[in-house]
Regions:
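Transmembrane beta-strands of outer-membrane beta-barrel pores
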Residues: 6-12, 60-66, 109, 118, ...
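Outer membrane beta-barrel transmembrane domains
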Residues: 17, 22-24, 194-324
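Glycine- and aromatic-enriched membrane insertion/assembly motifs of diderm outer-membrane
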Residues: 33-66, 180-216, 228, 244-247
């Protein structure tokens, strides 16, 4: 099976004045920070069945993250804060001394996952249970220094966002799905954990992440009349995505402010099928994020999040003879 996912994420964000921005005069930053943050993410991959119980998926992320600064600027349009400016992650970033603070690019992490079929009812109603284990391989497009580091009591120009956090990660997942003859005809979910195996070469220790994906889909009988050419609407469903992140940290800088968080995104999902067996999915979601303000360095923050994801799947009628 070959697949391609495209996701567009829109963040309308705000956070309070950064305390002690400058120990002497706060760099003149007696203002709140706000702006827009937009992610465009493509995930390309392939899944191959090794035997009747195991398959392997290899995928590669490509993405761009762009910030639109909505705070004060000077007469030339330059941001009045060293923390934010209008820029994209595809471009390198250097500070005033010419030190490279971020490596720009669009290539994200690569991923290899093995999944084992623990239980499968077959084509009819019943349960399906899968266990997965995998590895994330980091990209070199990272930031090179903590955004919260001070030099002579002041923050220097830096970038907060990045393509990769520079660490290898162990991925574990457990998936359960149930097919029924009444609504919802298909429901289930996946619990996934992502555990960093090392710090980045620049001393960043990423968060552990624990994610839950839940879905419930309708049947197709009443929807097949909705067609566009050879494509037909096969299912409408509800989704819920939950993501809990623990504290991240930098060497000699301590915990990263506002890094411990809980994100939940309810959404609606549309599945579109074709006679060839190919499938197209569209998910529209609204996100809500809660920050655990437990440390003195944490600040008040609020974000409105919207997401649209389009995924495409095609099953190849091919057999790799050496695997069977």
């Amino acid at each position: 099976m070959l697949f391609a996912d495209f996701s567009y994420q829109y963040f309308d964000w705000w956070h309070d004045i950064i305390p002690d921005a400058n120990e002497f005069d706060m760099n003149g930053e007696r203002f709140e920070h706000s702006g827009l943050f937009k992610n465009k993410i493509i995930n390309l991959g392939a899944t191959v069945g090794i035997n009747d119980y195991w398959n392997v998926t290899i995928s590669q992320f490509f993405l761009e993250r762009c910030m639109e600064w909505d705070g004060p600027v000077d007469e030339f349009g330059n941001s009045l804060t060293v923390h934010h400016r209008t820029e994209c992650s595809s471009i390198d970033f250097f500070n005033d001394e010419g030190t490279q603070m971020a490596y720009g690019g669009t290539s994200g992490d690569a991923r290899i996952n093995f999944r084992y079929l623990l239980f499968n009812q077959g084509k009819g109603p019943g349960n399906r249970l899968f266990f997965g284990i995998g590895l994330d391989i980091p990209s070199s497009n990272v930031i090179t220094e903590s955004p919260w580091k001070k030099t002579d009591g002041e923050y220097t120009p830096h970038r907060h966002f990045y393509i990769s956090d520079g660490a290898y990660k162990l991925n574990l997942d457990l998936q359960f799905f149930n097919k029924r003859t009444k609504f919802p005809v298909f429901w289930g979910g996946a619990f996934t954990t992502s555990l960093p195996l090392n710090d980045s070469k620049y001393g960043f220790s990423p968060s552990n992440r624990y994610q839950l994906n839940i879905l419930a889909l309708s049947g197709s009988n009443s929807l097949q009349k909705i067609k566009l050419g050879e494509y037909a609407l096969s299912s409408i469903g509800l989704t819920l995505f939950v993501d809990y992140a623990t504290r991240s940290s930098w060497d000699n800088e301590g915990d990263t402010p506002n890094s411990k968080s809980l994100l939940y995104m309810p959404g609606i999902n549309f599945l579109i099928s074709a006679p060839s067996g190919n499938g197209l999915g569209i998910n529209i979601a609204r996100g809500y994020q809660y920050y655990f303000n437990e440390n003195a360095s944490d600040i008040d923050e609020d974000t409105d999040i919207y997401s649209v994801t389009i995924n495409y799947r095609t099953v190849l009628d091919k057999i790799i003879e050496k695997l069977y």
